[in-house]
């Protein structure tokens, strides 16, 4: 009887398992239907280097061009004369600001343009107490929501805040305040060595008027000033990990002099900075340990230790999401011979700038391979592109970039020009889908992701987006199949876990009732059998 009972239980379990398999079949048919009729290429502008993204194995997968180079402008074409050295570019409220400097006063400029790169204002200096003061070495630039223009000057080691008076060519800059270099009188953590090293380079200003400066030759972190322009410390300095032995020695053995010699921070050099719409700071690092970065590429998992870009909160903690197929470090192929065909591009991407876009996206500029990488909020690479090669007028030494709506602007120090890229229909569809997802409009996002697949049937993030939509709708069967198509293990595990819960919930009561029925039937049969035996014995 026990053997019969065990067989019945196993039979019921097998039926449940087969139910899971049967449930997956309609989902596979839905996924196949969504790819049916999709094309792998569309009629878009071509470039010398194919645009691409990465799959879960770290392979480059070509995708439609997300941006097209539509204009390239230098100082002469702009009507401001030859720009000897372009430095930085920043977009705000439909206007583009560019800084340039050189060996003479006329080379030092702050240029304002409209979105189409038409000249609006050409400033060669500012007004202080009614007197004109020429720029010396303008470098980084930032514009606040109120229209205040902040500029760093590497010759005076200062940050200047300007108010704009007038409009167009007649507009002039009036100095509102000057934030000088930190001094030994400002804080005990500032010494003469720091004062000599400090050269302000790039900056951002938050909504409370706190100023964050990336300074050349400063490896203590990002230099911060309060709303009054007073030195306020360092943000996001490198963390020191003290081993247990050193902790013991510091607590019980070391003298005060020996304790002071223990490093309090790991030297870290930032080279650029930007502010997102939520007020968080994005910063790029001038260098990182190549061995660590390579290890993270192989592991396909990024950490703060191998980061080339960070998202910092006001405490200096890195909160950047790195959930993509590869870490957000630019090119994952250390020697990208397939894309570049040039051994001079060997090595890690050299990230020189970061620009925050809409809906949590951000773009990184690599001046090693001259590529631009655009990521979403979770750290997935949306696409990488470069446009024409150098021989066709493309960028040779890109140094800065910024975004304004559907446009990306990049500065090239070699040609002393600004490059203007416009989104293609493919990128517009991707960004629209991301926007709808951020707004919680999953059904509408699903329609747009299907449109993305019409441009590129191999675009994994479209399947991921469709899978998320199905997941949030509770359609775990379809979601698991879509996540399987894009090889996303994390989301596939989530969907499969929910699917298993759903199936078990549906079959739980039938299983329990079946087992109880078997037990009751067994008990009844046993009673009947015993009664029959007693009757036979009485007879």
What would you call each of these model-derived segments?
Residues 223, 283-308, 359:
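Short, conserved, GDST-rich strand-edge loop motifs in beta-rich repeat architectures
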Residues 95-98, 148-151, 210-213, 280-283, ...:
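Conserved beta-propeller blade signature
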Residues 74-108, 285:
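Beta-strand-rich domains and repeat architectures in extracellular enzymes and scaffolds
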Residues 39-80, 121-133, 172-195, 230-265, ...:
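Surface-exposed loop and turn segments in beta-propeller and other repeat-based domains
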Residues 462, 495-496:
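TPR alpha-solenoid repeat register
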Residues 18-34:
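Sec-dependent signal peptide cleavage junction
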Residues 393-434, 477, 490:
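Blade-level signature of beta-propeller repeat domains, shared across WD40, Kelch, NHL, RCC1
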Residues 77-88, 134-141, 191-206, 248-278, ...:
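Signature of short aromatic-glycine-proline-rich micro-motifs recurring in repeat-based ectodomains
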